[in-house]
Amino acid sequence: MQKITAQTCIDVVIPSGTSLQNLRTSSLNKDNGMDLTRDLYHMDYGISRYAAAATVFRTLLTPCTGISVEGNGYRYSNSSTSTTGYSTPVTDANAPVAIRAALEACREPYAVTDMSKF
């Protein structure tokens, strides 16, 4: 991405992939073989998508509105361990970790942040 943004007129990159990589270094990445995906390729329906949404919000809306995603009360409570539709529910306990993964991705979009303390 750095190469593409340097060679084009693209000014903003939404680092959703980086936020997922950050999340994978946290305690939320359970040893279930799914790696926070729903099918080993796509983000799981719960916490991974929540982190991606927080990244989009922080990248596009926060700079224009000054509104922060912290304190957002939305929770996705569905849980599934299906190998075709895995979903880690978003809870009051893990939502701040996903939001932190998004924050760190926006701060350092081209580097993975170690979140093992979260």
Identify the function of each model-found stretch.
Residues 33-118:
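Conserved catalytic region of serine esterases and O-acyltransferases that act on ester linkages
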Residues 1-34, 53-65:
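Extracellular serine-dependent O-acyl
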